[in-house]
Amino acid sequence: MLILGTPGSGKSFAAKREITNVFIVTKDDIIICDPEGEYFSLVRAFNGQVIRISPTSHDYINPMDININYADDDDPLSLKSDFILSLCELVVGGKNGLEPVEKTIIDRCVRLVYQDYLADPVPEKMPILEDLYNLLRKQEEAESQRLATALEIYVNGSLKVFNHRTNVELNNRLVCFDIKDLGKQLKKLGMLIVQDQVWNRVTVNRSAHKSTRYYIDEFHLLLKEEQTAAYSVEIWKRFRKWGGIPTGITQNVKDLLASREIENIFENSDFILMLNQASGDRQILAKQLNISTHQLSYVTNSGEGEGLIFYGNTIIPFKDRFDNTLMLYALMSSKPEDVEKREKLGIKGRDDS
């Protein structure tokens, strides 16, 4: 599923409305990646779990986490290696991403770093980023030293929030990863690591015949770098195959068509909710989804909660008029006046926790 719209068109409200409906009428697990801290009140109202990841928090998620069901073939390390390559691309890669030699070195070290854990999969043997860093330092190639140096700030420096074993229990049915306080330098990395944590949850739930819903706000941030985008597209496909239901929320339609590979996300989305669109994005969507000129009028200067729904080969206009006197409306709205209303009702906000 995709939720597309300009700022202020009601994307987050639409996502929260969908999350609320799923929470009430299904038994699916729901996980949210929240880059702007917008989902706190709703999640807490449903007794969900908010995990705040920041350089100063004490909640940790380990990017090296893996389980034996991580992939659907005999080699879970292949997919994990793709993830770590994506992570290293964000940390190390310049304009052209990682060099082939660097990819080879990383892949080699990934296979080495998990040897002890896969031989005896107990929690205390799960590697952390520092173990990968130490292995890189031991390699003979000059490129490995460059990789290790780039990782150093994430292991021993001021950005070491991801150099810990996971210390939060993710057993709640509704989980929100609040990464607002990671800052610009760590946010994309945080989104990628959360996505990997969700994949681990999907693999566990598959065995229990349970669906996993994943909502990714500011989804376009994962599509900027080539390796990261390729990994995200692959995970998107695997989510659907393994009983996961991903929802990307973004204002940047152009990023969804940045390459033929990324375009597969469109082709693998049965349901697209389009709110008000910028002029250039309207033309892209019209071509991609075969939307008529008349239908485009519903996403041209449209009001909040108005637009088009694309489902299968059907396109229908909609207007969502939600009763703004309800407490649920106050929980879902991010308008300042509604935040104030929540406070008057005694509902804790993100900064009150």
Regions found by a protein language model. Give the residues of each.
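Short coil/turn connectors at secondary-structure junctions
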Residues: T26-D28, K210, S269-D270
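Glycine-rich phosphate-binding loop of nucleotide-binding enzymes
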Residues: M1-P55
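Short, charged, low-complexity patches
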Residues: P7-K16, L77, S81, K187-M191, ...
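H-loop/switch region of ABC-family ATPase nucleotide-binding domains
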Residues: T250
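P-loop NTPase motor domains
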Residues: G37-Q49, P55-S57, N62-G244, L257-R260, ...
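C-terminal regions of RecA-like/P-loop NTPase motor modules
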Residues: T6-G8, V253-S353
